[in-house]
From Swiss-Prot:
Designated name of the protein: Exodeoxyribonuclease 7 small subunit
Main function: Bidirectionally degrades single-stranded DNA into large acid-insoluble oligonucleotides, which are then degraded further into small acid-soluble oligonucleotides.
InterPro entries the UniProt entry points to: Exonuc_VII_S (IPR003761), Exonuc_VII_ssu_sf (IPR037004)
Keyword GTP-binding tagged: no
Chain segments carrying region Disordered: 63-83
High-level lineage: Bacteria, Pseudomonadati, Pseudomonadota, Alphaproteobacteria, Acetobacterales
One function term, GO molecular function aspect: exodeoxyribonuclease VII activity
Gene: xseB
UniProt subunit comment: Heterooligomer composed of large and small subunits.
Keywords for this protein: Cytoplasm, Exonuclease, Hydrolase, Nuclease
EC number(s) on file: 3.1.11.6
Family to which the UniProt record says this protein belongs: Belongs to the XseB family.
Annotated localization: Cytoplasm
Catalytic activity: Exonucleolytic cleavage in either 5'- to 3'- or 3'- to 5'-direction to yield nucleoside 5'-phosphates
GO cellular component, one term: cytosol
Amino acid sequence: MPEPIDAMSFEDALSELERIVRGLEGGQMKLEDAISAYERGAALRRHCDAKLGEAEMRVRAIVQNDDGTTGTEPLADTGESGR
């Protein structure tokens, strides 16, 4: 059984997505297998997009202080708890 997508790192999800794309491009999959692979690939893409969005928010929160040192700035509260 494949690893749950929510538990995957960005790198692992991207690697699996690349394998799926290569398999689909090869044209050797049976139709049902191709559809299942496409569905998982779409979910992996959404997961990767979310991970990139989170990383972008973290990078944007890094600021340079007046004294030239680098610090972080708290992100605006999104109303979501547990993150």
